Curated annotation (Swiss-Prot):
Assembly behavior: Component of the gamma-secretase complex, a complex probably composed of the presenilin homodimer (sel-12, hop-1 or spe-4), nicastrin (aph-2), aph-1 and pen-2.
Membrane topology reported for the UniProt record: Multi-pass membrane protein
One Gene Ontology term from the biological process aspect of the record: Notch receptor processing
A Pfam family it matches: PEN-2
Keyword Membrane: yes
The protein's name: Gamma-secretase subunit pen-2
Phylogenetic lineage: Eukaryota, Metazoa, Ecdysozoa, Nematoda, Chromadorea
Keywords, alphabetical: Endoplasmic reticulum, Golgi apparatus, Membrane, Notch signaling pathway, Transmembrane, Transmembrane helix
Job of this protein: Essential subunit of the gamma-secretase complex, an endoprotease complex that catalyzes the intramembrane cleavage of integral membrane proteins such as Notch (glp-1 or lin-12). It may represent a stabilizing cofactor for the presenilin homodimer that promotes the formation of a stable complex.
Organism (species): Caenorhabditis elegans
Lumenal side stretches: 1-17, 79-101
Transmembrane segments: 18-38, 58-78
Expression by tissue: Expressed from 100-cell stage in most somatic tissues, including neurons, muscle, intestine and developing vulva. Little or not expressed in early embryos.
Length: 101
């Protein structure tokens, strides 16, 4: 999809839709939103529509960073306790070590 051919109003609408879709626990959509609209939000001269795009891009960046931190912390926490051989970690995994099943 070539977003350079869209009008500013349609860009704002598309950026808003991607932000709302990302708010449904889909952080990868926020990352796509950031990459697609970053140049419109920060590299081109500012106007009323680009100000709205900038708002959604900044919110997408903040949301993506939040989810990356949360998922990384969970992975570190889980792997740390799984290496200790605690029983509850086996209930949270789909991949069982050899000899455990």
């Amino acid at each position: 999809m070539d977003i350079s051919k869209l009008t500013d109003v349609k860009k704002v609408d598309l950026c808003k839709k991607y932000f709302l879709i990302g708010a449904c626990f889909l952080p990868l959509v926020w990352i796509v939103n950031t990459f697609w609209f970053f140049s419109d939000a920060f590299c081109k001269p500012i106007n009323a529509h680009r100000r709205q795009i900038r708002k959604y891009v900044i919110a997408s960046i903040v949301g993506s960073i939040f989810w990356i931190i949360v998922l990384s912390a969970w992975e570190i926490f889980f792997q740390h306790y799984r290496a200790q051989g605690l029983v509850w970690t086996d209930f949270l995994t789909f991949v069982f070590p050899t000899g455990r099943v």
